[in-house]
Amino acid sequence: MSRIIVEATTSDCAVTTILGLLRCGFQAKTARISYNLNKCLPPPEEFDKYPLILVGTLKHSSLAVHVYSVTAGYGGTGPHAMVDILEAAGFKFEDSDILTADHADSNGQIDLVYHR
């Protein structure tokens, strides 16, 4: 499986990049969200721990897209960018899953998986 790392400096840049991939034909089938409210973003070199990983296909090839600068668990710009990406990719979910800490465990960890 090929991999694209989206290490944008802002969540808005991440949204723009993902929208471009979607326009080029990327079809996300699975979205994995993993974010810790207490630890915030992982080190940039640990791309397997990025807050959003989209898995799907682009031109009949398997592709994983690791997105760095989006977050979850509160109402800021990072979580709103996550919502924008998930909506654009066609996932069904409740905004409150992303914009609140309702799904955080006692350590502040949020882990969600959506399928299309």
Enumerate the predicted regions with their spans:
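Mixed-charge, Lys/Arg-enriched low-complexity segments
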Residues: 83-116
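Extended, alpha-helix-rich binding/interface surfaces that flank or overlap catalytic cores
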Residues: 2-6, 12-22
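Hydrophobic, Leu/Ile/Phe/Ala-enriched alpha-helical segments that form helix-helix packing faces
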Residues: 18-25, 85-90
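Ser/Thr- (and often Asn-) enriched beta-sheet segments in non-cytosolic proteins
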Residues: 3-5, 30-34, 111
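A short, exposed loop/beta-hairpin motif centered on an aromatic-Gly-Thr core
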Residues: 3-8, 66-75
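Amphipathic, interaction-prone secondary-structure segments
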Residues: 21-58
